[in-house]
Regions:
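Bacterial Sec-dependent N-terminal signal peptides
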Residues: 1-33
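Charge-rich (acidic/polar
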Residues: 2-3, 27-126
Length: 126
């Protein structure tokens, strides 16, 4: 009986270890996807908005943070209304941060192209 318990405990520990390992791998993939998406959108923004190097770095950080939060909301929320509220909140947060980084002219161009950026962002968090 004692050896059966030891075997069961070993199997349980092995299974738990495997689950933790897979969860960490999935989280790393989500972060990589957020980084990739932020690079794609920020590079597009750099050419359309004529961002300087300092702005590019700040916009990249803002976009990456947005994508990480949006992906978490997409994955962690089953209610469509709640999900939409969270994405709207994260979008407003991103816009506010971008407004402080961009010039007035750049921000106007950004808002004119916002739908296209949003479509591109969705490719990376849905």
């Amino acid at each position: 009986m004692n050896s059966k318990i030891k075997t069961a405990v070993k199997a349980l520990v092995s299974t738990m270890f495997f689950i933790v390992l897979m969860t960490n791998a999935a989280t790393a993939q989500e972060k990589d996807k957020a980084t990739e998406g932020a690079k794609v959108v920020t590079t597009q923004m750099k050419s359309q908005l004529a961002l300087n190097d300092s702005q590019y770095t700040k916009v990249m950080d803002v976009n990456k943070t947005f994508l990480q939060k949006a992906a978490e909301a997409e994955k962690g929320t089953t209610n469509a209304t709640e999900k939409a509220k969270k994405i709207k909140m994260f979008t407003d947060e991103r816009d506010s941060k971008l407004k402080s980084v961009l010039t007035e002219t750049q921000y106007k161009t950004y808002t004119a192209n916002k739908a296209a950026y949003g479509k591109k962002f969705r490719e990376f968090y849905q």
